[in-house]
């Protein structure tokens, strides 16, 4: 089978797997495409992203539920149950780590080296920022700091590329601003910086809304709505003296904002 036939086959299987909600297989199929070291089409890029988003999303939801139950058991003083939950939670954390590390490897070894400047580059650096952010959600100590630093670096690279190559109304640029602001709010506990970034992205897009083509109008306005929802939610968290709020009792906020695909 030729490389182009292989590619066609992998993409078709990935679409089938998505329909069947078999996201691990969807990811495997799209990793096969990435391994060909070719520039992915928009459709292929989205298939890869959706597959990974579902694979990681299920574990992130599990982790949040387990953390919440663990907290309740600790509050009640049920040490044995808390210990059981902790062990189970750590199993989920290992899965999360493996998925995130897998994403980074595919991005660094195949996707970024094969990407053209512009949209693709922004997309992959944003994706890298997202998956380091997911690591920072559950890591602690130096590992958390390292994941947060890497996430920041990736988001900054994505932002520099987006500002150079994409208009403020572009859905990928808006999605990047949305997720980067969630990073500031949830990981760095900086509601003020989160709001500044979200508001700037929203205002810049509003001023150029009339330039939006019909194709991306729906996507862009949906993300703008999420930016506005998060701004409303976060503004109440900014202390009156203007300083960023620190973590309450050292615990990170869970589910502090909406993020994009």
Swiss-Prot record:
GO terms for biological process: protein localization; signal transduction. Pfam families: 14-3-3 (PF00244). Residues 238-261 are annotated as: Disordered. GO terms for cellular component: cytoplasm. SMART domains: 14_3_3. Gene3D superfamilies: 14-3-3 domain (1.20.190.20). PANTHER family: 14-3-3 PROTEIN. Belongs to the 14-3-3 family. This is 14-3-3-like protein D. The gene is GF14D.
């Amino acid at each position: 089978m030729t490389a182009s036939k292989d590619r066609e086959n992998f993409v078709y299987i990935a679409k089938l797997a998505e329909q069947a909600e078999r996201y691990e297989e969807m990811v495997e199929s799209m990793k096969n495409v990435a391994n060909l070291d070719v520039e992915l089409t928009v459709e292929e890029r989205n298939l890869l992203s959706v597959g990974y988003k579902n694979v990681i999303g299920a574990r992130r939801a599990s982790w949040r539920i387990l953390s919440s139950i663990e907290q309740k058991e600790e509050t009640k003083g049920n040490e044995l149950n808390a210990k059981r939950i902790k062990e189970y939670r750590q199993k989920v954390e290992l899965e999360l780590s493996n998925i995130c590390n897998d994403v980074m490897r595919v991005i660094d070894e195949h996707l970024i080296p094969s990407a053209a400047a512009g949209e693709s580059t922004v997309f992959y650096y944003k994706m890298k920022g997202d998956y380091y952010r997911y690591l920072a959600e559950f890591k602690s100590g130096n590992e958390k700091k390292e994941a947060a630093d890497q996430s920041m670096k990736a988001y900054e690279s994505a932002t520099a590329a987006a500002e150079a190559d994409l208009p403020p109304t572009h859905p990928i640029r808006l999605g990047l601003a949305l997720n980067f602001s969630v990073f500031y709010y949830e990981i760095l506990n900086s509601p003020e910086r989160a709001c500044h970034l979200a508001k700037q992205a929203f205002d810049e897009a509003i001023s150029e809304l009339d330039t939006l083509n019909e194709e991306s109008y729906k996507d862009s306005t949906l993300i703008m709505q999420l930016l506005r929802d998060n701004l409303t939610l976060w503004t109440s968290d900014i202390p009156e003296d203007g300083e960023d709020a620190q973590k309450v009792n050292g615990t990170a906020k869970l589910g502090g904002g909406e993020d994009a695909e």
